[in-house]
Amino acid sequence: MTTKLKQRFVPQLAAVNHEFEDDFSKMLETVDTSHIKPGTVVKGQVVDINEVVVVDVGLKNEGRIPKSEFLLSPAHKLPEIGDLVDVYIEKTEGHSGKTLSREKAIKEELWGQLELICSKGEFVDGTIFGRVKGGFTVDLSGVVAFLPGSQVDVRPIKDPSSIMNIRQPFKILSMDKKLGNIVVSRRAILEESRSEARDEMLSKIKEGMILEGTVKNITDYGAFIDLGSVDGLLHLTDISWARVNHPSEVLEFNQKVKVMVIKFNEETKRISLGMKQLDYNPWEKIKEEFPVGKKMTGKVTNFADYGVFIELKDGLEGLVHSSEISWLKSNQNPRKTLTIGQEVEFMVLEVDTEKHRVSLSIKQCQQNPLIKFAETNPVGTVIKAPIRNITDFGIFVALSDNLDGMIHEGDITWEDNGNELLKTYKKGDEVECKVLTINIEKEQISLGIKQLTPNPYQGIADEYKKGTVVKAVVTAIKDDGLEVLVNDKAAGFIKKSDLSDEKEEQKPEMFAVDQEIEAKVASIEKSTNKILLSIKAYKIAERQKALKEYGSSDNTTNMGDILANALEDSKK
């Protein structure tokens, strides 16, 4: 229990320093208390401490101040009975006498000093002692200021406790006396000192220097390294001689790293850093270790859309392109046939020391099944094979488990109805066919069914030369012309425009099936071996022949008679 101080306190302004006198009663009678007004700071004496701190400033009633106003920060302590303290007068009258404030007294005392410091741009010492929403509280020797989270440091702080309860400088950003708010910055101090250190470091930095730094930020293309007062970029390709898909595979935030300055731009002040440059370059003797044509084994390390990566040795990989995985399935998905960690045999195809690339092949270590097939089934060989697949343009037959041959629709029959015959085949049917071509480079085998029988149109070009007059029978009437059979053995066709030399008679419907006609050979269609005929050319030739033969015998004979006679002779 505390003992209340009985002797009354002689009031005085906070700026005045009087000593107590023995005759306290006499002094009280002569003391002028007119200076004690609301809004002033005066000295008072602590006369009691219980739930509150009781302070006597020399008036009729003593003031009661909450203990919390004496404990604004961890550095502050409660006063003891008898101590003199500065207090702020809020009221001088009331039911409980005057109202005092220790907190306002402290602020009033320090505010002027802080305003002067702020106007000069000087720094003020303080201590971070608490966390609040959006930042921290800072004790500026009794005045509490706000430190926003964005003003704590130049980079995010992982452990805020490391900067708390430490006396350190701050810069005052703003002051509002009416609201009693002060905003400070720790970052501004760091940036200023960092700027000076940055200029000093940039003046000394040289390419080839080896420095230590901290990973400040990680991006898809690399990592930014804090070198103390400046940052440098460690590009993805300069992290390791081995393939790195993302910097986070090797680096982590706040990690300490040793780097080399590989490039410094004097104008932009940009610093490019490298880690791999501190290690042995495996590409220096790569061609000696992995000569082209050498067969080796290695483990599958990673897949890509365009192939698979295989480990050559620690930190070094080679690429097997999708087209080099199998002889039979070009550009196949490597995930369907290989697994991570699988040991595979490969051959070195190419080594590019400039681009740091090694091209490998898995299929080159295996016998090409097309070569094996060609050895046992040369062109002209007749084979039997089951149909594996049917498409719009032909048939694929299975020559082995992983080898197919193709029969194009044009190689199914000598006639021009291969597309129709294609529909009569079904998957699994065994077909007999002949090997037509084997293209090792393109990895293609062409087969044919029609080649099993002689070409019925062989020699047609010799027999039916252009201009030859032939007899034919109409076999079908089409919108675009007539299909005919020439000399009872060869297929022919007469286009609509070749049906007559008269425009109004160029109509297929004017003819009938089985009708016999005479026409001239216009050409041979090589793709179908079909003979293209022309009635128009035949009639024009006959007319010219008649004119030549009968036209000069009698000038009085009319043209109609000449043609009639010529046609009559041609029918004999």
Curated annotation (Swiss-Prot):
SUPFAM superfamilies associated with the record: Nucleic acid-binding proteins (SSF50249)
Annotated GO biological process: translation
Entry keyword annotation includes Cytoplasm: no
Gene Ontology molecular-function annotations: mRNA binding; structural constituent of ribosome
UniProt xrefs under Gene3D superfamilies: Nucleic acid-binding proteins (2.40.50.140)
GO CC, alphabetical: cytosolic small ribosomal subunit
Pfam families: S1
Listed SMART domains: S1 (SM00316)
Domain S1 motif stretches: 39-103, 121-187, 208-276, 293-363, 380-450, 467-536
Keywords: Repeat, Ribonucleoprotein, Ribosomal protein, RNA-binding
Source organism, top-level taxon: Bacteria
Entry similarity comment: Belongs to the bacterial ribosomal protein bS1 family.
Function: Binds mRNA; thus facilitating recognition of the initiation point. It is needed to translate mRNA with a short Shine-Dalgarno (SD) purine-rich sequence.
PANTHER family found in the cross-reference section: 30S RIBOSOMAL PROTEIN S1, SMALL RIBOSOMAL SUBUNIT PROTEIN BS1C
Record-linked NCBIfam families: PRK06299.1-2 (NF004952), rpsA (TIGR00717)
Name of the protein this chain belongs to: Small ribosomal subunit protein bS1
Species name: Rickettsia bellii (strain RML369-C)
